């Protein structure tokens, strides 16, 4: 069973990220019968997802947010925050540098560090 994955513009996704839309019941009898369901995952604009993150079914990640490496995202993450952990939780409001990257003063290029 597959459900939709909606991704915004300029989304950075690190290596070994798992984005899952399908799930199954914890109850053995229902699982034996093959019951399964799917929920969409929505990733906003200008989101940065660190390496090794797991995103579970039904989660929405808001615009301009940063998800720390190795996090397990089990619930919605609002816009403009830095979140990390297992389970993923808000660490702080995203600051200008967190949301838009760092300007390299030597060459004037913008990059996320």
Model-inferred region functions:
Residues 103-112:
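S-adenosyl-L-methionine-dependent methyltransferase catalytic module, highlighting the catalytic core
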Residues 79-81, 86-104:
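Conserved beta-strand-loop-alpha-helix hinge in the C-terminal portion
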Residues 62-65, 78-80:
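Conserved catalytic segment of ABC-fold P-loop ATPases
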Residues 52, 70, 86-87:
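Gly/Ser/Thr-rich beta-alpha loop segments that engage phosphate groups in nucleotides
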Residues 75:
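Active-site nucleotide-sugar/metal-binding loop of Leloir-type enzymes
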Residues 1-59, 94-95, 99-102:
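Flexible, glycine/small-residue-enriched loop-and-beta-strand segment within the central core
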């Amino acid at each position: 069973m597959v459900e939709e994955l909606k991704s915004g513009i300029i989304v950075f996704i690190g290596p070994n990220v798992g984005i899952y839309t399908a799930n199954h019941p914890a109850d053995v009898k229902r699982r034996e019968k093959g019951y399964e369901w799917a929920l969409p995952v929505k990733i906003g604009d200008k989101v940065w997802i660190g390496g090794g993150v797991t995103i579970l079914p039904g989660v929405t990640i808001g615009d301009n947010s940063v998800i720390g490496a190795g996090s397990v995202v089990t619930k919605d993450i609002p816009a403009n925050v830095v979140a990390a952990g297992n389970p993923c939780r808000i660490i702080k409001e995203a600051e200008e540098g967190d949301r838009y990257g760092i300007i390299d003063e030597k060459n004037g290029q913008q990059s996320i560090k």
